[in-house]
A protein has these predicted regions:
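Conserved acidic carboxylate
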Residues: 47
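Receiver (REC) domain active-site loop signature in two-component systems and cognate sites
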Residues: 93
Length: 245
């Protein structure tokens, strides 16, 4: 990660110093969640302040394929087009704010699995409650350091990796009690939409195992999404491609 100078624009709203924990951050490594294009995980930054957007983009360019948008509407379209591994969004933006963006991403089965970190200029309990109510996974109050954001992103992606590990081992449990327990853990960790998605595609595959018509095109049509979107969602939730699943 690049050590960029924190933009002056972020200091205007706070007089509190930035707390850096260099020892902790130095030991963190990003999970390698491959993408279809670059082999890097995809980070979508939705931020209308050009300085802040540039600061985050340059800080993570070495470890992520970085996408940017200047408002929630642009961010939503980027998310639908590319299905990023994680979204970092400001709250106060023109056209569509970050709360609305988060809500719409979490309510769309194509993007409901994507972790969202919201950035806010004020440490307001009301703002945080509203964000968590629409499915935000984490919050950061400006000003923040790139290393702190890195830690949040890393933790969210590591949590997803652990869930994937649970998912991949549930088919070979020691006994039925273990299988039931693992399924409960997975179900509790996923949203309602993502649980319904897994149940639907599992049923589709099981019902058509002997059919010649079952392929990526058939499954993507039945799941009402493109083949590439289905691939990325399956990889994000299970660690397996559609064919492997």
């Amino acid at each position: 990660m690049t050590d960029n100078i924190y933009p002056n624009a972020l200091h205007a709203d706070s007089t509190e110093p930035i707390q850096e924990d260099t020892n902790q951050e130095a030991s963190l490594e990003y999970p390698q969640e491959a993408t279809l294009d670059t082999g890097k995980p995809i980070l979508l930054i939705v931020e209308d302040n050009e300085e802040i957007q540039k600061y985050i983009s340059e800080s993570f360019a070495d470890s992520f394929e970085v996408l940017t948008a200047y408002n929630g509407e642009e961010g939503k379209q980027q998310a639908l087009n590319r299905i990023p591994d994680i979204v970092v969004s400001d709250i106060m933006m023109p056209v569509m704010d970050g709360i609305t963006l988060c809500r719409q991403l979490k309510e769309d089965v194509q993007t409901s699995h994507i972790p969202v970190i919201l950035l806010t200029a004020k440490d307001s309990l009301q703002d945080k409650e509203e964000g968590y109510e629409v499915g935000a996974d984490s919050y950061l109050t400006k000003p923040f350091s790139a290393s702190l954001l890195r830690s949040r992103i890393n933790n969210l992606l590591e949590s997803r990796k652990k869930l994937i590990a649970q998912f991949q081992t549930q088919s070979v449990p020691d006994n039925q009690a273990d299988l039931k327990e693992k399924r409960i853990v997975i179900a509790e960790a996923l949203s309602k939409l993502d649980n319904e998605f897994i149940e639907k595609i599992t049923l589709l595959i099981e019902e058509n195992l002997s059919s010649e018509k079952i392929d990526i095109t058939y499954l993507s049509d039945k799941m009402c999404m493109s083949g590439s979107t289905l691939y990325r969602k399956m990889k994000a939730l299970t660690g397996l491609s559609t064919n492997e699943y």
